[in-house]
C-alpha cells in the first residue's frame, strides 16, 4: 500500500484516467428526431455562467493504490487503510493495473434493449427552495425506497418478495425525485450528451468543460438563484432491472477461464456482503441495496444528496464507465455538526420536515459547512475506481456526465459499535432499521465461539475470529455492552413482568418491531396476554400497555445469566465455551443461515453452457443461492442437529462418532442440474439391527435421496449422479478429474473441529471404544513427535485453553 500525501494526491490527480478533453463536435445536433415536446428531448433553459462559478475551497480525500497482493483480500485492505482514511469520511481506491473487469451492461441485449426508470431532479431547488405543504409519517419511511422489513414479506428462502414493486412517485415527492421517462442505456447516453453539449455550448467551440469547471457551475446552480436546471438520474436501480455491472454466473465446474478472478473477487460487489469476516453474512434476508448492489446511471449535474448509510454501514461504490463522479465527505465524528449546520441555515425546511436528511432530496454547500467548522473533503472518482465511505460519514456528490456506478454496503467487525449507536439513534427518532443488529451481533459471537473451539484444523478461519475475542476483543465488548444495556432496561421495567423464554421462531417468518420506536425485537420483547393477541410487542424501553402486572411479560431469547456466560466464553473460559458450543450447534440452523464462508463464483464461457444470473431468477434456480459455486477444497458444513449418543460398534468408526438424529447441511452441485449449487441435508437415522443409516437428500427436491450404511458411500452416490448428469449434458466427453473423489465424512461435517468436539462431548465415558482407542493412539503419536521435536506448536493441538482434551 502506497502511503498518501498532499504530493501523492496532486500526482494522482494529474495522472488520473479522467476522460480526455475533446472538442464539442455537434455532429448529433439536428439528428435528434425527438420533437421538443418529447420527454426524450432534454429541456435546457439555463446556460453555463463561468464568471460566477462557486467551486468550494476544500481539502482532498485520501487516495490509495493497493498492490496486487493487497488487493487480494478486500476486507483486510479496508481494515488496513481505515486508520488512515476514516477521519476523512471517504476515500478513493485505485485498483492495480491488472484489474479491469468487463461490464456486462455493455452487451447489446442490455445496452440497447433493457429499459430503466429515471427520477427527475430540479438541481436549482436542491438547496434553495421554500417549504412545501406536506406531511411525512414520522419514522414510517425508509430512505432510498428500502422497504420496511414488515412490509416486504420474506420468501421461505430468505429473499425479499418480488411482489413488492418499485416505489412510485407520490404527491409527497414534489422536488428532486418525481418519476421521469424510461430509457435504454444507449438512449440515455445520447440524452445526457445532448444536455451537456447544449448547457456548456461555447461560441469558440474549444472543447468540453473540465471537472473543475463543471464543479464550479454545479455549486453556482445550487447556491445562487438561477433558471430551472432539470436533469434525470437512474438511481437506486434494483437487481431485476438491469442486473449488476459485474459478471456473475455458474458454469460446468471442469472448465476454467480468465474471468474467474473477477467473478470470485471480493471487489465484485455481488460478493462483498457475504465475504468471510463480513457481518452482513449473518443476515439471512437478501436486502436490496444493502447486501444486493444497486446501479446508478447518471448525467451531468445528477445528484446524490447528503446522507449516511442505513444503520451507519460502510459502503463501497465502483465506477463502471463514463465521466467522473465528484464526491464530498464529512467524517462520522462530525456528523452532528453537519446536521446542526443544515438546520441552522435551512430552518423552514427542517421545521416542516424534521427527518429531511433521511429523504436524500437536499443538497448543501461544502463552503457553508466549512465556515461552520465542519470539515469536508472532495474525491473525484474516475471509471475503474472505488470510493469507500465510512460509518456515519455523511456524503454527497454529483456526476460530470453520462456514467454508470454500482454500490453496496459492507460491515467489517469494527462496525459493531457504530451499528449499536445507529440502533439507539433510530430508536430516538422512531425510525425503522434495515437490519436486525442483535441477530448480526449474536451471529458474530456464535461464529467466534465455533472458531475458538476449533483446534488442529482450519487455523486461518480460527485466527481471523479469535483476534476479535478475549477480554478486550471487539465482539466480546459488543456483547458485554449489549448485555449491560439490556440488564439496566429490564431492571427499570420493575417486578411487574414475568420472564418468558422466547420461542426460537419468534421472528423467523416476520420481523418483530417495537410498536413505540420500531426497534428490532430479536433479543427481547415486552408483551401482554391481553394485548399481544394483536401481535403487538414493545422493546425493553417501552411498555405497550397499562394492564395489570400479572398479564405482562418479557420474552428473552437468552437470559442475563446466559449472556454473561457468553461473554465469559468469548473471554476464553473453557466451561462456558463448551456450554455455548453446544447451544450454537443446537440452534445453528436458526441463527446462522447467513454462513460466513467465502463466495467463489464461476463465469460462463459460452452462452449454451451457462445461465445469466444477473436478472431475475427463473423458477428452477429460485431456491439455489444464485451466482455462487463452492470451492471444492473447502466444503463448509452447517450443523442443524447434534443428535444423541448410541453406544455400539456400528455407531462409530475410528474416525468419527455417529450420533443418532445427527443432521447437517452443505452446498454441492445439484444432481438435477450441475450448473447450479443447492443445499443437501445429511442425516443419521436408526435402522434397528442394521445400526445407523446414513442419508443425503437434495433439500429442494426430497425425492432425490441417497441412503447407505456409510457416509462415504452416500456421498459417492451423489457424486456419481452429478458426473452422469454432466456427461449427459455435454456434446462431447468432458474432463471431470476435479470430481473424481469426495470425502463423505467431511461432507457430513465429521471433520469440522467444532463438530468433532461436540460429538466427543456426548461420550464423556468413552463408550465408543474403537473411536477413542484410535484417537488416544493418534494423540500419543502426536505427543511423541512433539516431544522429539520440542515443538510447542504441535503440543498445542492436544490442548484447548490449557485443558487437556484427550
Swiss-Prot record:
Compartments reported by the entry: Nucleus
Amino acids binding Fe cation: 307, 309, 395
Recorded phenotype for the gene knockout or disruption: No visible phenotype under normal growth conditions. Increased sensitivity to salt.
Domain FYR N-terminal: 629-687
One of the GO BP terms on file: regulation of flower development
Domain JmjC stretches: 261-427
Name of the featured protein: Lysine-specific demethylase JMJ15
Reaction equations catalysed: N(6),N(6),N(6)-trimethyl-L-lysyl(4)-[histone H3] + 2-oxoglutarate + O2 = N(6),N(6)-dimethyl-L-lysyl(4)-[histone H3] + formaldehyde + succinate + CO2
Lineage of origin: Eukaryota, Viridiplantae, Streptophyta, Embryophyta, Tracheophyta
Source organism superkingdom: Eukaryota
Residue ranges constituting the JmjN domain according to the UniProt record: 61-102
Positions with biased composition (Basic and acidic residues): 9-21
PANTHER family for this protein: LYSINE-SPECIFIC DEMETHYLASE (PTHR10694), LYSINE-SPECIFIC DEMETHYLASE JMJ15-RELATED (PTHR10694:SF127)
Cited SUPFAM superfamilies: Clavaminate synthase-like
Residue stretches of biased makeup (Polar residues): 158-168
Amino acid at each position: 500500500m502506497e502511503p498518501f500525501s498532499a504530493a501523492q494526491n496532486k500526482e494522482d490527480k494529474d495522472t488520473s484516467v479522467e476522460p480526455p478533453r475533446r472538442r464539442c463536435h455537434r455532429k448529433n445536433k439536428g439528428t435528434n428526431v425527438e420533437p421538443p415536446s418529447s420527454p426524450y428531448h432534454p429541456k435546457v433553459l439555463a446556460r453555463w455562467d463561468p464568471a460566477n462559478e462557486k467551486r468550494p475551497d476544500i481539502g482532498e480525500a485520501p487516495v490509495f493504490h493497493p498492490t496486487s497482493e493487497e488487493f487480494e483480500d478486500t476486507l483486510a485492505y479496508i481494515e488496513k487503510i481505515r486508520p488512515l482514511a476514516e477521519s476523512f469520511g471517504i476515500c478513493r481506491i485505485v485498483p492495480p493495473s491488472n484489474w479491469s473487469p468487463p461490464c456486462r451492461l455493455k452487451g447489446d441485449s442490455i445496452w440497447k434493449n433493457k429499459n430503466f426508470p429515471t427520477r427527475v431532479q430540479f438541481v436549482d431547488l436542491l438547496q434553495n427552495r421554500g417549504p412545501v405543504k406536506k406531511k411525512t409519517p414520522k419514522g414510517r419511511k425508509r430512505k432510498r425506497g428500502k422497504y420496511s422489513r414488515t412490509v416486504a414479506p420474506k420468501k421461505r428462502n430468505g429473499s425479499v418478495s418480488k411482489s413488492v414493486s418499485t416505489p412510485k412517485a407520490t404527491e409527497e415527492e414534489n422536488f428532486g425525485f418525481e418519476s421521469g421517462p424510461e430509457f435504454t442505456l444507449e438512449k440515455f447516453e445520447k440524452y445526457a450528451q445532448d444536455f451537456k453539449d447544449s448547457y456548456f455550448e461555447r461560441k469558440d467551440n474549444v472543447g468540453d468543460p473540465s471537472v473543475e469547471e463543471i464543479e464550479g457551475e454545479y455549486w453556482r446552480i445550487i447556491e445562487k438563484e438561477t433558471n430551472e436546471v432539470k436533469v434525470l438520474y437512474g438511481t437506486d436501480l434494483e437487481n431485476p432491472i438491469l442486473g449488476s455491472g459485474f459478471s456473475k454466473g455458474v458454469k460446468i465446474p471442469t472448465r476454467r477461464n480468465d474471468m474467474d478472478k473477477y467473478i470470485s473477487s471480493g471487489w465484485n460487489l455481488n460478493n462483498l456482503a457475504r465475504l468471510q469476516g463480513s457481518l452482513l453474512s449473518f443476515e439471512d434476508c437478501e436486502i436490496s441495496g444493502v447486501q444486493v448492489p444497486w446501479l446508478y446511471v447518471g448525467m451531468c449535474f445528477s445528484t446524490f444528496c447528503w446522507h449516511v448509510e442505513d444503520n451507519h454501514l460502510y459502503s463501497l461504490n465502483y465506477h463502471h464507465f463514463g465521466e467522473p463522479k465528484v464526491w464530498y465527505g464529512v467524517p462520522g465524528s462530525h456528523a452532528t455538526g453537519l446536521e446542526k449546520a443544515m438546520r441552522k441555515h435551512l430552518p423552514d425546511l427542517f421545521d416542516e420536515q424534521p427527518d429531511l436528511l433521511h429523504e436524500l432530496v437536499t443538497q448543501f454547500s461544502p463552503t457553508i459547512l466549512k465556515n461552520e467548522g465542519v470539515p469536508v473533503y472532495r474525491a473525484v472518482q474516475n471509471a475503474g475506481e472505488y470510493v469507500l465511505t465510512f460509518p456515519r460519514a455523511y456524503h454527497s456528490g454529483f456526476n460530470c456526465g453520462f456514467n454508470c456506478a454500482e454500490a453496496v454496503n459492507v460491515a467489517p467487525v469494527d462496525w459493531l459499535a457504530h451499528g449499536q449507536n445507529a440502533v439507539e439513534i433510530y430508536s430516538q427518532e422512531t425510525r425503522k432499521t434495515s437490519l436486525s443488529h442483535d441477530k448480526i451481533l449474536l451471529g458474530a459471537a456464535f461464529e467466534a465461539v465455533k472458531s475458538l473451539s476449533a483446534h488442529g484444523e482450519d487455523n486461518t478461519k480460527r485466527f481471523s475470529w479469535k483476534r476479535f475475542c478475549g477480554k478486550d476483543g471487539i465482539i466480546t465488548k459488543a456483547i458485554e455492552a449489549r448485555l449491560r444495556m439490556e440488564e439496566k432496561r429490564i431492571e427499570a421495567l420493575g417486578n411487574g413482568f414475568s420472564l418468558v423464554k422466547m420461542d426460537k421462531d419468534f421472528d423467523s417468518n416476520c420481523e418483530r418491531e417495537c410498536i413505540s420506536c420500531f426497534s428490532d425485537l430479536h433479543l427481547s420483547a415486552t408483551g401482554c396476554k391481553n394485548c399481544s393477541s394483536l401481535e403487538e410487542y414493545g422493546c425493553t424501553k417501552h411498555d405497550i400497555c397499562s394492564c395489570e402486572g400479572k398479564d405482562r411479560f418479557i420474552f428473552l431469547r437468552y437470559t442475563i445469566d446466559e449472556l454473561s456466560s457468553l461473554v465469559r466464553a468469548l473471554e476464553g473460559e473453557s466451561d462456558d465455551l463448551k456450554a455455548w458450543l453446544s447451544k450454537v450447534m443446537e440452534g445453528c440452523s436458526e441463527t446462522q443461515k447467513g454462513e460466513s464462508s467465502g463466495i467463489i463464483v464461476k463465469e460462463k464461457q459460452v452462452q449454451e453452457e451457462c445461465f445469466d444470473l444477473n436478472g431475475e431468477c427463473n423458477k428452477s434456480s429460485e431456491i439455489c443461492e444464485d451466482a455462487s459455486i463452492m470451492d471444492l477444497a473447502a466444503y463448509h458444513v452447517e450443523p442443524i442437529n447434534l443428535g444423541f449418543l448410541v453406544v455400539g460398534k456400528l455407531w462409530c468408526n475410528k474416525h468419527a462418532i455417529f450420533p443418532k438424529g445427527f443432521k447437517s447441511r452443505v452446498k454441492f452441485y445439484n444432481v438435477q442440474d450441475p450448473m447450479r449449487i443447492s443445499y443437501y441435508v445429511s442425516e443419521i437415522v436408526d435402522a434397528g439391527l442394521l445400526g445407523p443409516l446414513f442419508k443425503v437428500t437434495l433439500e429442494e427436491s426430497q425425492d432425490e435421496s441417497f441412503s447407505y450404511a456409510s457416509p462415504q458411500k452416500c456421498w459417492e452416490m451423489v457424486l456419481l449422479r452429478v458426473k452422469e448428469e454432466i456427461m449427459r449434458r455435454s456434446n462431447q466427453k468432458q474432463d471431470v478429474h476435479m470430481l473424481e473423489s469426495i470425502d463423505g465424512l467431511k461432507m457430513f461435517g465429521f471433520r469440522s473441529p467444532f463438530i468433532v468436539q461436540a460429538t466427543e462431548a456426548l461420550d464423556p465415558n468413552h463408550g465408543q471404544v474403537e473411536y477413542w482407542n484410535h484417537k488416544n493412539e493418534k494423540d500419543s503419536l502426536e505427543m511423541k513427535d512433539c516431544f522429539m521435536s520440542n515443538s510447542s506448536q504441535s503440543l498445542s493441538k492436544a490442548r484447548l485453553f490449557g485443558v487437556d482434551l484427550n
